[in-house]
Amino acid sequence: MSDSLDHFRQICGTAHVLTHEDPSTDLSAWERDWRKRAQGRALAVVRPANVQEVSEVVKACANAKISIVPQGGNTGLAVGSIPDDSGQQVVLSLQRMNKIRSLDTANLTVIAEAGCILQQVQTHVEEAGYLFPLSLAAEGSCTLGGNLGTNAGGTQVVRFGNTRELCLGLEVVTAQGDIWHGLSGLRKDNTGYDLRNLLIGSEGTLGIITAACMKLYPQPAAQLTAWAAVPSMEAAVSLLGLAHERL
């Protein structure tokens, strides 16, 4: 294992490979779930800065038969982003991959890396006059990669759909360490298998999402908030249908 750790340090730099070898290093932020109900133990927390480093780390883990736990903001409540307690798994944290690569105002898309905080993406496009409608309670700490990995819904899911409906393309590192460049902004793409939708919601089991091309919308001219009390579930459904027709 020490050879693998040295290899990780060569790829990402010593400062970005955290282990229990140093007693002063606290890995609990990566090893403990958000509710503090589960605690794992990692062989190492590896923090690559770009897709090439992710690819090299994955190749090194594949060659050494080391399991990988991809991790974004670690805000999930289902204990799906922390290692087990074996001390043999690598937590691959994408937090350093937090750049917004481009904003296409003609195609209404933004390309952002997986480690971008959701609120960071929202603010960036709002300043340019657009809306990225994915919104949820953890938006100040969850990452775009985690949203894609779990196919998050959020508070505007009824109108705009899950994260899957907001994504046009992905950049992914496969289990072999190959890089799939699928950051197409096409609204219609019939070329081959729909790997994008297969990968979204797979929680890192089929590949590691490193960047995504996401849909944007014009900012609404005005917003009104109403509190509506309804007598039954059927009435709530009818009200929703009426809102779709009139708003």
Set out the residue ranges of the language-model regions.
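N-terminal flexible segment immediately upstream of the FAD-binding catalytic core
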Residues: 1-59, 76-108, 137
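Residue-level marker for well-ordered alpha-helical positions
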Residues: 2, 52-55, 62, 119, ...
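Short N-terminal amphipathic alpha-helices
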Residues: 21, 68-70
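Feature of Fe-S/electron-transfer and energy-metabolism proteins
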Residues: 22-32, 40, 46-52, 60-63, ...
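Short coil/turn segments at beta-strand junctions that form active-site/ligand-binding loops
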Residues: 64-66, 88
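Residue-level detector of anion-binding/catalytic polar loops
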Residues: 66-67, 131
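Glycine-rich beta-strand-to-loop/alpha-helix junction loops that act as flexible
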Residues: 71-75
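FAD-binding subdomain of flavoenzyme oxidoreductases
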Residues: 99-247
